[in-house]
Amino acid sequence: MIVDNSKDFDLKSFLANLTTHSGVYRMLDKHGEIIYVGKAKNLKNRINSYFSKGAKDSKTLMMVEQIARIEITITPSDYEAYLLENNLIKQHRPKYNILFKDDKSYPYLVISRDKFPRVSFYRGKSAYKKGQCFGPYVSISSVKNTLNTIQKIFPIRQCENSYYKSRVRPCLQYQIKRCLAPCVGLVSQQQYDEQLAILKKFLAGKFSSVLEEISAKMYQASEDMEYEKAQVYRDQLVVLRKLQQQQIVDIQEDKTFDVIGIYMQDSYASIALLQIQNGDVVADRHWSIDAKGQDKTSIMHAFLSHFYLGDEIRNIWPKNIILSKVEFADITDLMNSISQKIGQAINWIIAPAADNLKWLKLAEVNARQKLNIYTSSKSQYQKRLESLKEFLESEKDIKRIECFDISHFQGEATIASCVVYTDDGEDRKSHRRYNIKDIKSGDDYAAIHQAVSRRVSSGLEADNLPDVMIIDGGKGQIHQAEAVFREYGIQDKVQLVSLGKGVERISGKEKIYKGFDDTEYTLDEHNPGFLLLRQVRDSAHDHAIKGQRKKVSANRQSSIIEEIEGVGPKRRKALMMYFGGWQELSRASVDEIAKVKGISKKLAQEIWECFH
């Protein structure tokens, strides 16, 4: 239940009437933004402590000064409170909470929700939306190797739905016994589901159970004189047993565990997580954060909640977790909540010895090294920001920079890229591209005008305009952006600057133009602010090129056949229905192409020559 939802907030009355139940509280500022999320066993005691006369660190004092309203949610148990707290922190990213940015999105194997499901892989936490997930895997290569192994053992389809729906005959995968061809009805729903169920057990790590089940099915099929079916099971067993023999390490040895090391220096902290399976380091992940006013225990508490109570899907959980030394009593409840979520007991090792101590020291060495790199990079970036601020004569700190670049192929497939840098560095998740429409071929000025106009329009609506907008180009390009700024009346809200290569077109010799200022500026090529301008510009250029190449590739594939005389919409559709896609068509022989209804041998030869 939300206790307060009004604009007029009486803090004194609120504190006096607080419940003593467990739950989650949210601190909001005068703008209605959540600035802190916390969890408490006793909401009344915890929230009142912020306003008591006891000693508090500077960060807490600063936060309390900004509190305009407090909201609470009562939860039935500590476990639910931890989950809600973690979800709210990830959703709102309050500025006074300890925040972790995952180093990268890990790949998952996904079994889709189709009638005849496919197995594939996706990156990131959104994978669960595609179907049932297994993972995460350490790298793309490891997940691809697993997919390849699966295809040798379990004949479950891996093709895209568009390809699957267009089939009128079995593909090569069926011929080499790596797919049951549900696309053309060569397998019953029951048979397919049976293979799928065994595959799921295999991916869940139930190796012995899979061997027993397939063996039993093989003998049963043999007794029922279904010899072809028995042979399929026998072939599966052969591959599985070879795979089993390759596992040199005894899986019964308890060697699956996580090691979490923390290193703190000044106002920063770094967490290194080593994931150990069967005695080998299979993953090294790390997080570096601003930890001003925090101690090691509070950082560990926040990390454990973020990593183990988050929404990352995993099928294998560590039996042991080794931690840097923290106050055990302060995280006991959280440990219990993690075990409750997993559904199994975890052995928490906070005072490791012998080999466990060696693992912890290794994690802490990794954390220290990562923090040194992080602080060095952050310091250099802050110097560049300050230098740019000085050059632009800005009165306020630069919190957000956006840069636009245009890319096209011979005047066509025009793309505008927009990359984002914050005071923490590049924000890849906020990068975007604009498909430019309804302009003359190769008109970069019109493209810049359209892209900037669309961004400013949406930025005013969402109230998220940047502090600085960079345009890749010279006077002509910046004049287009100036026109947009005048149209929307934001000349005083966003600082505009462009970077042109000039006559020499040499990196480091670019000409700089400020918005609404006809002066041509130059800076020393080693000037920190100039280096930042070029860094952001280069990032925008790369982002634009990648998007434009994708667009050209898509356009080319669909236009290759259109160039052949005699191949109209009906024949193109027939070709796609028969082969399922451009890739399969490009691999087909002349004789195979000629089998398509309406395609003569001569026309098949012309189509084949288009791809070779």
From Swiss-Prot:
GO terms for molecular function: DNA binding; excinuclease ABC activity. One of its GO terms (cellular component) is cytoplasm. Keywords: Cytoplasm, DNA damage, DNA excision, DNA repair, Excision nuclease, SOS response. It holds the Pfam family GIY-YIG. It is found in: Cytoplasm. Residues 208-243 form the UVR domain. The keyword DNA damage applies. Its main location: cytoplasm. Belongs to the UvrC family. The UvrABC repair system catalyzes the recognition and processing of DNA lesions. UvrC both incises the 5' and 3' sides of the lesion. The N-terminal half is responsible for the 3' incision and the C-terminal half is responsible for the 5' incision. This is UvrABC system protein C. The lineage of its organism: Bacteria, Pseudomonadati, Pseudomonadota, Gammaproteobacteria, Thiotrichales. The gene is uvrC.
